[in-house]
Amino acid sequence: MNREMLMLIDAISREKNVERDVVLGAVELALASATKKLYKGEVDIRVAMDPDTGAYETFRRWLVVPDEAGLQNPDAEELLTDARDELADIEEGDFIEKPVESVPIGRIGAMAAKQVIL
């Protein structure tokens, strides 16, 4: 499926005269959106797709916020002191990322990318 997705990305890019990276980014956003629906709350999801192979990884992210600010969105934020328990050199504004299960591309990626481009 990954190779087929890359062929579809190339076809949409040519058909709509849009740079390939823009279409690839749209597919990543579509997959992230589909993954978010698997979670309760306002989670932050990032998908990274290899532009050469079509392989992709999905990550759940937490924004590191200052302790005094408190957590406004516990599903997508982590306090600085707690974050430093995991990563000593992390700073405010950085993200903690942990891999999560990726949703299959299927039609979701293709259709959502097309909608973003249109």
PLM-predicted stretches and their roles:
Residues 1-118:
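Charged, low-complexity terminal tails
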